[in-house]
Amino acid sequence: MSLDIDQIALHQLIKRDEQTLDVVLRDSLLPTNAVVEEMMAELHRVYSAKSKAYGLFNEQSELADALKRSRKGDEDFLSFSRAATGRLRDELAKYPFAEGGVVLFCQYRYLAVEYLLISVLSSCHSMRVNEQLDLSTTHYLDINRADIVARIDLTEWETNPESTRYLTFLKGRVGRKVSDFFMDFLSAAEGLDTKAQNRGLLQAVDDYCADAELGKNERQAYRQQVYSYCNEQLRAGEEIALQVLAQELPKLGEKDFQQFSAEQGYALEESFPADRGTLRQLTKFAGSGGGLSINFDALLLDERIFWDAATDTLTIKGTPPNLRDQLQRRAGSK
């Protein structure tokens, strides 16, 4: 992995009681060695694989102003990280899910792009066996479960300040959303809405097929082509590029897909990240609620599965063998 660490600082937040969150600050940057490089490579890998939200700094963002000073050389990276950790403590202490942890600030390069990653990592306990086969306790950073993480694409931020996607952060699931907490700490606003972009793409595909008056099977085959490209991009960690997608799709009528979507005003970006859950709707129907979960291929609609909109009734002809076996055994036990 071509990841080059420029500067890295570690500090710590210690929760003394329900109202007190203390700060322990390092007096020097963390020396870069093989252990540090391995840790950052793992954190970069884990973060890159997770679903993220996008944002941009508010005009009055203190962290953005401090970062600009650091980038210009008016303030060194260690001082920047120490002051930011203090603001982080003040913000985090407002929320009920506040816990201690190791606060990490790392400025690094990956594939010619400069990043600043900020994270609060939990420390976990485990057991180890030494060479004498004795047991002892050990502590480790729980990188795989890190959920308080934000990353700033410094290259994008400095070369394209109007961008709405140079800042990314993870969406948490405890108490008030961790994403809300990071918005407050960073003084940032939500930027590119990835799910909205993917929903817009699906709508554009359906409208394009309808405009060409494709039949049911032709329409589903077209959706499958769109899904195949998007899924490949998702698996490769790449974005959906409308121009490339349009080149891979058969042209319907006088306009290709990119021309059609631009003229119809779907407000799609030239490229945007793929959203797995939204894209799945191209080939499947799925839903759950009230103790019921249903998932089936879109091709089965009106073939083996029928929906009556008037009565909101779904009729299934031919049940899966394992389901049928369970139903028969339950019926036989009555």
UniProtKB/Swiss-Prot annotation:
Protein family per UniProt: Belongs to the YejK family.
Superkingdom of origin: Bacteria
HAMAP family membership: NdpA
Recorded GO CC terms: bacterial nucleoid; cytoplasm
Pfam families on file: NA37 (PF04245)
UniProt keyword list: Cytoplasm
Protein name: Nucleoid-associated protein YPTS_1390
InterPro entries, per the entry: Nucleoid_associated_NdpA
GO molecular function: double-stranded DNA binding; single-stranded RNA binding
Keyword Membrane: no
Organism lineage string: Bacteria, Pseudomonadati, Pseudomonadota, Gammaproteobacteria, Enterobacterales
Location(s), subcellular: Cytoplasm, Nucleoid
